[in-house]
Structure formats: C-alpha cells, structure tokens
C-alpha cells in the first residue's frame, strides 16, 4: 500500500492484496492515493478493512478505472452491501460476503 502512488508508473492495473493484513488504515491510504486511479481490478478479500475502510474506498475520487473490487472475507450486512454497490456505481462488480 505504501507504493500505491507508483502503480501507474509500474503499469499495475490488477492489484491482489488478498490475505495481506491490509487494515482500515491501509484501505484509507489506498483510497486517497492518486495511484488508485489506474487500478481496474482490486482484490482485498480476507483483510480486516472494517466498515470505515470500505467506506473510504467507495468514496475515493480515484476509483475512476475500477471495474471489480473484491471485499470478501468480512461480514457485511445487507444495508452496507447496498450502500457499497451504490457508491461504487453500476459499472463496478462489488464482491462481498453478506
């Protein structure tokens, strides 16, 4: 996550950070990084991101290229699942565990 700003320079569009202990803070850092703008597919399954981390990703102004985000592994209630899908938009496949 510390190298998120360099993702475009490295040509990284598919980022698999599953099972990497990326927490709420890491999710917020990624969400606020300009490098997030180049990510098309983001796999964050099985990380303790928590609700505020998921909300930060959904609210990120840099999620413009995103097509798929995997937030599976944490329980997400139906109301939050609906909010996340709405925040990410119709063009993004949001994978969660409800």
Protein language model regions, located:
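Short, solvent-exposed loop/turn at the beta-strand->alpha-helix junction
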Residues: 1, 21-28, 48-55, 75-82
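Concave beta-strand-loop units of leucine-rich repeat
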Residues: 5-11, 15-21, 32-49, 61-62, ...
């Amino acid at each position: 996550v510390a190298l998120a700003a360099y993702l475009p320079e490295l040509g990284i569009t598919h980022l698999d950070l599953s099972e990497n202990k990326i927490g709420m803070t890491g999710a917020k850092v990624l969400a606020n990084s300009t490098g997030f703008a180049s990510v098309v597919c983001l796999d964050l399954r099985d990380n303790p991101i928590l609700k505020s981390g998921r909300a930060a990703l959904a609210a990120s102004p840099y999620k413009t290229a995103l097509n798929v985000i995997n937030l599976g592994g944490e329980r997400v209630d139906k109301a939050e699942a609906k909010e996340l899908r709405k925040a990410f938009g119709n063009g993004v496949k949001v994978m969660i565990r409800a």
